[in-house]
Amino acid sequence: AIAKYLALEGAKVVILGRRVDAGNAIVEDIKAEGGEAIFLVTDVMKQEVLEQNLADIVATYGRVDSLLNAAGGNMPGATIAPTGTFFDLKPEEFQKVLDLNLTGTVIPSQVFLKQMVKQGEGNIVNFSSMAAFRPMTRVAGYAAAKAGISNFTAFLATEVAKKFGEKIRVNAIAPGFFLTEQNRSLLTNP
């Protein structure tokens, strides 16, 4: 919905994602409404893939105005079942949730921020969550990762303003809880 809104307001939107069919569907929806968009396959955990994405974007559009870091998710082993306890968390899945959400925000920020510094301007918007501030029970890994994103955003905003000026902004949004296929079971089975 955000990508479509931005495209309909005149932005040239690049959807970066792993799922080709889903990414192409968003692009086709945007184009059907008169917007401009392309899809590029990426992996937010692989710097070299993101660097190639950036090169392709700059070759196509000449610049990057904004980066919206929205990759993320949760895993069953990083949550606590209704009948479980903290001791049932699986450390390896907890780490995967931290990696995808937090490190999956840091790496794209590193890659795309370099281009914004060259341009002298740009915007980064990171997706945190209300779970960072009011953690729901059961989503320990996700809440910890999103709290990390909020803290990272505050750090990066200060770092960028001090070293590169105020024309590059870094902010976060913290959406509330939306029922999706990814979280339906968690939110509807208390």
Regions found by a protein language model. Name each.
Residues 129:
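Residue(s) in the substrate-gating loop at a strand-loop-helix junction
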Residues 78-86, 90-95:
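Substrate-binding pocket helix/loop in short-chain dehydrogenase/reductase
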Residues 11-25:
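Conserved glycine-rich Rossmann-like NAD(P)H-binding loop of the short-chain dehydrogenase/reductase
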